[in-house]
Amino acid sequence: MGDALGRPAEGSRTPRFGPAWPISDYQRWPGYQGGRVGTITDDTQLTIVVAECLLTNGCLDPEDLARRLVVWLPDGRGKGVATTQAVQRLTAGIPWYLAGEDSAGNGAAMRAAPIGLLRHAHTGQLRAEAVLSALPTHRNPMAAAGAVAMAAATAWLLGCQPGTCVSSALVTAIQAAIVGLEKEPQPERRPPGRLTTLHDRLGELPALLEQQPEQVLSYLYNGAYVLESVPAALYCFMRSPDDMEQSLLLAANAGYDADSVAAMAGTLGGALGGEAALPQRLLPELEYREELLALADDLWQKALEVG
């Protein structure tokens, strides 16, 4: 849902914030790999790939994931550079543990939520499988940390009731899950280019909730870099944890990597509120709506089976 909303604004360098959102509904997006209103992008496509890998194997099997990525590539929509290059190597026969790019892009983070759903009661397995899920395309430690962060956030929110989400507690849980994964700080992409870690940037989020969205998202810079997009998605969610529509619209209208940030923000809202949290007016035109709901139900049943 988030990527379908945000795709027309992806790459926009002129963020627009409420109260009158320029993007308030699905829009047809023209050009390369354009689609009708409600069309999903690689964010949802790859989340489906991971979910189906988990359902088939009962765990994250990286060899199976690699095969599925190869099948996905020709029909991938809005593919990221690192993911594309890595899957091209997989297609050429390079093993999954050697194919990944040394990239801290968000291609692993945006597809990791199903691991949080399956392993919500098993922190160690969650962390290990989220790291494994990143490696076929992203071997950078920050990319792995981003995948663990999104899986851990999903798992933590599944244990909360709507109306009870405490932002500082969520951030603390994510930080605990990713501690030790980042070998060294990495630079911000915008001046002053300070060195920092995802762990530390996430720690800034509770205080940032006191500021206006345009200030915060200008500071976080919601691009495709894990250091930008994962905190931005969490911010959009935490600003309106019980109103998924507002989270999605904030992320979609912020431009830059709008589809991925909105997709991740929506994932978090869904983990907290379930199907009831989905904006009902956006469901009818959402591509693969029934398949996505069924897949989520199947994965939850699998999670209950494995305990």
Where are these regions (language model features)?
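Structured, active/binding-site neighborhoods that engage oxygen-rich ligands
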Residues: 1-307
